[in-house]
Amino acid sequence: MSNLAATPIVGGNTPPRRLGRSVWAIVAGFLAVLVLSIVTDVVLHALSIFPPLGQRMADRLFVWATIYRTIYGIIGSYITARLAPYRPMLHAVVGAAIGMILGTVGAVVTWNKDLGPHWYPLALIVTGIPCAWIGAKIREMQTSS
């Protein structure tokens, strides 16, 4: 039997891909968006800008939620691109694609629960890739100058 584990797959001069750092970059971007969104929601509820938890928000308040979540998506994608060991745009877009899949699942599960306007989860889904591109592009512009 041969020892395939000791055989290099691609030339001996290629650096390791650093899978752990790639995963961490994507997770860190998600965590940033999650924490920023939750903290903002809590503050807006505490200030009575948003109604108490359990009460349906007016549609116009979902516009504001969409705006700050879009900004947070850009920030999260920037963080992902910043931490990515290579190809920052790819990492940000992969993170956005995962977020879009999770957002789609969430939209399907909650569609008929009257939690808010139907356009809201759709807006979050379709802004994922543009947010990723903007966040990663900001990082790329920093590294190229």
Pin down the residues of each PLM region.
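Juxtamembrane/disordered regions of integral membrane proteins
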Residues: 2-145
